[in-house]
Regions:
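Short C-terminal domain-edge/linker segments immediately following a structured domain
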Residues: 71-75, 87-89, 118, 146-149
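A mature extracytoplasmic/lumenal domain signature
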Residues: 60-62, 68-70, 90, 120, ...
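Extracytoplasmic low-complexity, Pro/Thr/Ser/Ala/Gly-rich segments
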Residues: 28-83
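Short, well-ordered, aromatic-rich surface patches in folded extracellular/luminal domains
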Residues: 2-11, 21-46, 100-150
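Bacterial Sec-type N-terminal signal peptides, specifically the leucine/valine-rich hydrophobic h-region
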Residues: 15-18
Length: 150
């Protein structure tokens, strides 16, 4: 009869380290941001009265480089939160839909044009508020990168 308590004690000792691996039910289902595919993202902003031409390239690990029209380069690293958000936006199915949408030509003078390359998907828009609303997913990436890279 002594073997039953010993076996129970042994089983408890073996399973205790695994208790930390159990899900609590409070965690969201599905892949987290780290599980999303990491792709290179390139944003080009051009136009405006001064003839701006800036290109931001973000590597899959969040390192970025920004080059202006004169060739001056700056670099940095996205925060973990910004990188997670960028990965979520890069996986957004709206980007593919926005890439195939037909956009009428704009009549705005001196407006900024944005061209976004996310992996193999290219989207673009002209920031001309009275004529058109920017595509939502593309605009979200543009806003994120503009804020994060200065």
């Amino acid at each position: 009869m002594r073997s039953a308590p010993v076996a129970a004690l042994l089983l408890a000792a073996l399973l205790t380290p695994l208790a930390g691996c159990a899900r609590t039910g409070d965690e969201p289902a599905g892949p987290g941001p780290a599980a999303l595919p990491a792709v290179e993202v390139v944003l080009t902003k051009s136009g405006g009265i001064a003839g701006l031409s800036d290109t931001v390239t973000v590597r899959p690990d969040g390192r970025w480089t920004k080059v202006d029209r004169s060739g001056v380069s700056r670099s940095g690293q996205l925060t973990a939160a910004d990188l997670d958000r960028l990965r979520q936006l890069a996986a957004d199915p709206r980007l593919a839909a926005e890439a195939t949408a037909t956009v009428p030509p704009t009549m705005c003078a001196d407006a900024f044009s944005y061209r976004l390359l996310v992996g193999q998907t290219t989207t673009s828009y002209v920031d001309c508020p009275p004529q058109a609303t920017p595509p939502a997913a593309t605009h979200a990436v543009v806003d994120l990168l503009t804020r994060a890279t200065g």
